[in-house]
Amino acid sequence: MNVLRISKFLFLLLMSINGVGSVLAQTCSPPLGFVDTPHPTIAGTEELVSHTEEIIIDRPLAEVLKDLDRPLKDTIHKTSSLPGVSGEHMLTNGTFGVPGSRRLTCLTDGSTLEEEVLQREQTRNSFRFRYVVWNYTSEAARPILYGVGDFHDSDLGDGRTRIVWTYSFMLKQERFPGDMGGFGRFLFRVGFLDRQYADMMRATLSGTKTNVER
């Protein structure tokens, strides 16, 4: 085990997600040299590193879904260790939300990423929204090939709704820590996903609950 590599990875990860040298993105547009490429093929769950958070909102599903109309920058909550969203730029016609729609998202540290909707299904009692994120420009995300977000909203039938949000990452196999296989995925989980990223997920769900229950 190369302890020096592990220590360096965790140090750079923490420095990057804390916004060292960050620049506030005033507008959202494709950066110089940007190439809009198809998203990577999504692997099976056993190859991904995942984390799940859930929350109960004291409102029926129909009211919870109205919150989807909020701008992304007002939905994803910035934490002390992760940047927030500063803007969005559509890469396909129409609005973001239908399967196949794609956008560029700008973050408050000056970096960008791409998102595409993979799945959107709704019944009277449930809602599922699944999307892929890739083409990260943040230094902190260099080890990441792509991420997959998956929301499952369920009407509990008593005026409450359960939201379950799972976020999964595929690491680049040729870069550290992905090149260390299962142990590298473990390092990524305990050093980032179950800590700073989980904090962001909880803050976002809490913000949704507060907004919907007003």
Q: What spans do the regions from the language model cover?
A:
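Glycine-rich portal/gate segments that line the openings of hydrophobic small-molecule binding cavities
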Residues: 76, 86-146, 199, 203-214
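A short, structured loop/turn motif at beta-sheet edges
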Residues: 58-62, 118-127, 152-162, 210-214
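Intrinsic-disorder/low-complexity, polar/charged segments enriched in Ser/Thr/Lys/Arg/Asp/Glu/Gln
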Residues: 48-56, 102, 112, 148, ...
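Bacterial N-terminal signal peptides
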Residues: 8-19
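N-terminal secretory signal peptides that target proteins for export/translocation
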Residues: 1-6
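Hydrophobic ligand-binding cavity/cleft-lining segments
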Residues: 25-95
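Hydrophobic pocket/interface hotspot
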Residues: 60-71, 75, 103, 117, ...
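Beta-strand/loop substructures that line and gate deep hydrophobic ligand-binding cavities in soluble
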Residues: 133-195
